[in-house]
Amino acid sequence: MGIQTPNGFNLDNSGKRIVVDPVTRIEGHMRVEVNVDADNVIRNAVSTGTMWRGIEVILKNRDPRDAWAFTERICGVCTGTHALTSVRAVENALGITIPENANSIRNLMQLALQVHDHVVHFYHLHALDWVDVVSALSADPRATSTLAQSISNWPLSSPGYFKDLQTRLKKFVESGQLGPFKNGYWGSKAYKLPPEANLMAVAHYLEALDFQKEIVKIHTIFGGKNPHPNWLVGGVPCPINVDGTGAVGAINMERLNLISSIIDRLIEFNEMVYLPDVAAIGSFYKDWLYGGGLSGQSVLAYGDVPEHANDYSAKSLKLPRGAIINGNLSEVFPVDHANPDEIQEFVVHSWYKYPDETKGLHPWDGVTEPNYVLGPNAKGTKTAIEQLDEGGKYSWIKAPRWKGHAMEVGPLARWVVGYAQNKSEFKDPVDKFLRDLNLPTSALFSTLGRTAARALESVWAGRQMRYFQDKLVANIKAGDSSTANVDKWKPESWPKEAKGVGFTEAPRGALAHWIKIKDTKIDNYQCVVPTTWNGSPRDPKGNIGAFEASLMNTPMVNPEQPLEILRTIHSFDPCLACSTHVMSPDGQELAKVKVR
């Protein structure tokens, strides 16, 4: 049956149903169901979160100064970003300011997370949707070396290097123990890279696996550990003693120099390996420009990385803030997190209960009351769902909307907003990337564009880290060693009631926490995370979310090997290591694979 959504998508669920379950995400587990027509083109998409987070319930009546330690545990990969959002929310509620050094250190930690997450995402969670590992066994190492040297001056590019890696890969494959490469769709016609490009990509996969652990040392220096570094309402928990030995976590010159050397290395890797790899791989997929979904229509960015401490105005934020709707890039709307008419969450298709489910609630007034009921046309049981009924409740994810619009968030959304604002630091790299591939601007709104935006942002973030590291050192040398403001640390200094909002741009997109404090305890707490925006189910008007929209009208080579579904869903940066099930219309399993 065909239905046209208010946001412009024609849905038809009459064709064969394919179920991919589970696709594990940072904030929980995810399931995708699609209907394909006789030509194996996706005509209906259903995205569902299959785990209840419930952190809001856990936080009620707790000390707001401790909220960061709980919210940080929502996610173990984008570690720290929920903590930063939480301390900003508490600071906003209580009117707490932070020192300039704390702002620089927070930015360094957040930017290090951006680079680490983007590198890990591309090489270890997404690249194998584009790269055929087994094909690399037939590559010519000399030709691979020529290819690698043609795109960058990265030193690890000799024929001998690739020959040695190919030999190790061959032994790996012949052993039958493929480890991270097990159960891929190797040999699928959906792969387009020549063997040499595949071998180069596998080499860089392994190099990135080794390199990523260096980046997080920045978190251990400033935050004591990784994952889940320490944070502090009012600043950062690391004192500065440039002439000291670094005992008891104090920052001295030795540690500052170590951070500087790590920044140099990550800039080099971004600019000589990561971005060139994305461009090289993209050159073979120029005709696969599916997966745009909402990216060319409605995008949202909160902005982040404040230039100055305590200034969260759009002018101060180095990552852009704004909303674009209906594909009109000539108008970027301001965003106000406190305006109850802007951001609202709906639950008509979510496994929650509202007083009136036809109306949305602003997060300050949000309710997190579970209501797990399947739609009347669902197949299976609550504990063994075979097919969801998208006409009823079908997800643990709420449906946030900005002024009633479903929005995409993430690196692509950020760069589309920056591009629309004609900011050269965003527009020029995008134009160059597309020009080098001989692609039009419209190609940005695709799965490939989403992947490219993440690489471009990683390069940008590395350079910003150099800027804030130099700024921190200069400020310390000028005699300022303050890292925390504890003037309002004691609850006796707080008002009887207060409310605030904290926001960041997590690697995966716009993230905000809303808090209400009453009698020094948390009275209400709501998180709206990037996956809530992108993975949202339908709303009362029938608008579909970003995941669902991105899959629409995508052709599949083989529905029993849903590589195209994973390629697009992964471009939003899900983390996964789980089973995939492909079902026929009557619920019989056609194939079972491990998603990598």
Swiss-Prot record:
It comes from the Bacteria. SUPFAM superfamilies: HydB/Nqo4-like. Ni(2+) binds at C75, C78, C575, C578. Its cofactor is Ni(2+). The keyword Membrane applies. It is found in: Cell membrane. Its EC number is 1.12.99.6. InterPro entries: Ni-dep_hyd_lsu, Ni-dep_hyd_lsu_Ni_BS, NiFe-Hase_large, NiFe/NiFeSe_hydrgnase_LSU. Its main location: membrane. It catalyses: H2 + A = AH2. One of its GO terms (molecular function) is ferredoxin hydrogenase activity. Binds 1 nickel ion per subunit. It is a peripheral membrane protein. Keywords: Cell membrane, Membrane, Metal-binding, Nickel, Oxidoreductase. Transmembrane segments: none annotated. One of its GO terms (cellular component) is plasma membrane. Belongs to the [NiFe]/[NiFeSe] hydrogenase large subunit family. Heterodimer of a large and a small subunit. This enzyme recycles the H(2) produced by nitrogenase to increase the production of ATP and to protect nitrogenase against inhibition or damage by O(2) under carbon- or phosphate-limited conditions. This is Uptake hydrogenase large subunit. It comes from Bradyrhizobium diazoefficiens (strain JCM 10833 / BCRC 13528 / IAM 13628 / NBRC 14792 / USDA 110). The gene is hupB.
